Amino acid sequence: MKLLHVFLLFLCFHLSFCKVTYTSQEDLVEKKCLAKKHTHLSCNKVFCQPWQICIEGTCICKLPYQCPKNGTTVCATNGRSFPTYCQQKSLECLRPGTKFLNNGTCTAEGKFSVSLKHGNTDSEGIVEVKLVDQDKTMFICKSSWSMREANVACLDLGFQQGADTQRRFKLSNLSINSTECLHVHCRGLETSLAECTFTKRRTMGYQDLADVVCYTQKADSPTNDFFQCVNGKYISQMKACDGINDCGDQSDELCCKACQGKSFHCKSGVCIPSQYRCNGEVDCITGEDEVGCEGFASVAQEETEILTADMDAERRRIKSLLPKLSCGVKNRRHIRRKRIVGGKRAQLGDLPWQVGIKDASGITCGGIYIGGCWILTAAHCLRASKTHHYQIWTTVVDWIHPDRKRIVIEYVDRIIFHENYNAGTYQNDIALMEMKKDGNKKDCELPRSIPACVPWSPYLFQPNDTCIVSGWGREKDNEKVFSLQWGEVKLISNCSKFYGNRFYEKEMECAGTYDGSIDACKGDSGGPLVCMDANNVTYVWGVVSWGENCGKPEFPGVYTKVANYFDWISYHVGRPFISQYNV
C-alpha cells in the first residue's frame, strides 16, 4: 500500500493533475520572496516595457534614441510631437509628468481629461472622460470596468496607489440623460487613460456607468487580514495571487506558490490573468503561458465603433522590433536516452555550447560558449600566468580520437576573473575567457558551436527542475573519461543541509540525484549545468564548481549560480551579446 501511495504521488506531480490545497490564503504567498519587494519594475519577475531596460534586476528608463526607429507619430500633453510611442514613453519615464495624449500629430484644440462626478469627495465618483477628438464628455460603461482600468484612472487623477479595493462608491438615484457610454480597455500599467482603447456603447441608465473610489491614506487601519503592497497600499489578503493587479504595482501577484481561480501560475511564482494565456505575447518569463496553444480559442471581440488607437497593440509591435538574440536552440533535436558519473556518452551536436579548456597536460576543465568570442568557466580552473598557453577546443566528443575535420581550436586573448573570487571558499567561482580573433576578423567563427543563453533572473528555474550536466570528468572509481559525458540531475533547493555554512545560497546552486548516481566529478570543473525552459531554449544555469565524494548520496554537486552574475558578465562582454529580453 505504501508503494501505491508513492506511485500516485509521483504521477500527481509528473502529470500535474493534482491541485495543491492550501489551508489559508496566506499559504499562497511566498514570504521569503515578499521580503524582496518585487513590483512591475522587477525584471527578475516580469518583462520590462519596451521603453525600459533591465539593470541589476530593475527596469529603468531607456534614453529615447535607444528605442526602435519605426513607429507612428504621437502627441504628448505638453503639445510636443514624438516620432514614436516608445520615444514618448521613454521621455515620460525619465521625466514623469508629461503624458501620452493621442496617436498622431498634435493639434491646438487637442485635450484629454478624466474626472469623477457626483461624489462626496474628489477621490470618488462616476468616471467621466473627454477624448481628444470628441466635443463632449462621456461616462465610462460599467461592463468594461475592472481593477485594471480603475487603477489607471486613479493614477491619471494623481492618486499614486491607484484604486481602493475595499470601498465602494454609493450611488443614489441620479437623473443622467445619457444614451451612450464609453467602453474602455487597459492593460493596467498605463499612466493615463488616454493610452487605453475606447469604444462606444449604449447605456440604459446610471446603473450601467463605471464608478471608482481612489485609494487614500485615510483608508481604514490595516488588520491581520490585509496584504501590504510595496507601494504602501493595503488590500484584502483574499485578493493576493488571483491574477488581478489590485496593488497597482503588481506586488500582490509576484510571490505566489499557486494562483486562485482561473488565473495562470507561472513557474517563476507570478500569477497572470487567464486571458493572457495563449494571447500571442509571452508574459511568464519562463514562457509556459504560450506553450500548448494549438486549438486554443480566443475570445471574439464585439464589433463596435473604435474611437482611439490601440496603443497596447503598438506596445506589442515595438517589442517585436527589439533586437533578437539567437542562443540555446540546437540545430538537431536532442534525443533523450536512458538517464560525469553515471552519465552517457554525448553525440556530436548534443551539447553545442560545451567546450574543452586544454593546456599542456590535456583537457583539464570544461567551459561554456556564450556567444561572440566568449567562454564562461570556473575561476579555479585557470591561472592568469598561463593565459596564452590555453586552447579552447569545440565540438569535441572524444579527445583521444578527435575528429580533426570538425574540431575548431581557438587561442585565448585574455582571462577575466571575478574580482571577488575566493579560492578558499569557492565564492564567485566564475571567469570569462576571450578568444583571439583571426587576422582582421571582427568576431570569432565557431561554425558548429551554438551559444547557451545566459539567465538574467534567479526565478527562471526552480528546485526539482531537471537539468543536464556534462564534461570529461572522472567516474566515481576515479577512472579517467576521454569521451564527453552527460547526465540528468535535479536542482536542489538549499545545500546548507549538506554542506553547512560552506554553501552560499545567493552565489551557489546545488544539483544531483538523491542516490548520487549522476554527478559532476573531478575534471568536469568549469563545465555547464544547463536547463531548458518551456520552449526548449537552453540556459547555462550553473558552472561546475565544487563538491565532495562525487557520486555518493547526500553529496550533490555545487555550481556557481550564473543568474547571479548576469550584470557582471554583461559588463565585460557587452549587454547585446547575452540579453534575450529587456534590451
Swiss-Prot record:
Highest taxon above the source species: Eukaryota
Disulfide bonds: 33-255, 43-54, 48-59, 61-93, 67-86, 75-106, 141-181, 154-214, 186-196, 229-247, 259-271, 266-284, 278-293, 327-453, 365-381, 373-444, 467-531, 495-510, 521-550
Enzyme class: hydrolase
Catalytic activity as recorded in UniProt: Inactivates complement subcomponents C3b, iC3b and C4b by proteolytic cleavage
Chain ranges of the Kazal-like domain: 55-108
Function comment: Responsible for cleaving the alpha-chains of C4b and C3b in the presence of the cofactors C4-binding protein and factor H respectively.
Subunit record text: Heterodimer of a light and heavy chains; disulfide-linked. The fully processed and mature protein circulates as a zymogen, and is allosterically activated by substrate-induced remodeling of the active site.
UniProt name for this protein: Complement factor I
